[in-house]
Amino acid sequence: MLLRCCVISVLGLFLLPGTYSGVARKDTHVDITDQTTLLDGIGMRAAFRFLRSWMFNIVGRTGQRISGSFLQEQIPSDVPFPCNVSLGDINVIAAMGDSLTAATGAAASGFVDLYQENRGLAWSIGGQWNWRNVTTLPNILKVFNPKLVGYSLGDAYPFHRDSQFNMAEIGAVSYDIPYMARAMVQRIRNDPRVDWKRDWKLVTIAIGGNDICSFVCTMRYPEQLPAKHRLRLQRTLRYLRNNMPRTFVNLVSVPSVSKVVMLQRKPFACESLHHGECSCWIGKLYNQSDSSRERWSKIQDEYIRVEKEIAESAEFRGLDEFAVVYQPWSLNVSMKMNGKDTDYSLLSYDCFHMSQKGNA
């Protein structure tokens, strides 16, 4: 009887719905990114965290590597810092996003390394080492303000201390951003290093790659996705505007999926991994074709248009303590470098995420 009760209790824990899933949704159609399942239960989250912690220890801190083609060339100590701007007013840095913001596999030299999140190397939120060997936004800001807080300190998962104010989650989609914003505000506000009302905060939002890569082809009405993206971004930005004083938001464009997954003559490992990482574009699981890829590409273009319009909308303009700037990061991205049509050293082992060099 005792064993039976324990089993029932454990099953009950796993079947509990997610604590943030009780909000009624106003969207006309409920698509796959709006749904919660048994996998969102509290028990499953605990199990997932345990599994990730186990993998973290197995893989090890790959972000500490100091040699490899995936790393940028170190800038010599006799080369002065090239910028001459006043950025010292920014005291807090944070970020929200998916595996690109988590710098998944940035220091990967093999398949297993892709399980590691090298957050200290992420271009928008990584603060490992310094700008000479890890040229990231936080490491540049630290030149002007050594007391900057919030940047990721090294390899970490979201629940690790070294993640700091990097709220990114692997597999995250647009639907997750409002929740991330609430969690981020709580984390920053509770940090004793932060002067909540006086410190200026820089937040980078980069999301959407998984929507276009893995979910758009599973939806009944995929053309509605940009409108949903608009509502979620508006909800997120309004929450930050109303709840976090002195905030500057970098809204980064959705990454260009086709420029990566449609590369020609990819290594076999990359081709194989792309079937899982971007199944709406690669393989036959969802009857991918040139026609379907063109359809997804148009939806991605709408994502980009929506993001630009939101950043430039009147409700986020002319405010004393809040601003949004659109960063068209992926629009002109190119893999050409060092005389190569595609320099794979800019990409991680899976040719999908960015290497440390690519982040720099």
What is the meaning of each model-derived region?
Residues 343-360:
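Histidine-centered active-site loop/cap adjacent to the catalytic His
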Residues 110-232, 238:
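Conserved SGNH/GDSL esterase-like catalytic core that processes O-acyl groups on lipids
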Residues 97-108, 255-270, 329-334:
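Short, solvent-exposed beta-strand-terminating loops
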Residues 16, 99-101, 170-172, 208-212, ...:
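Conserved beta-strand elements of beta-rich interaction domains across eukaryotes
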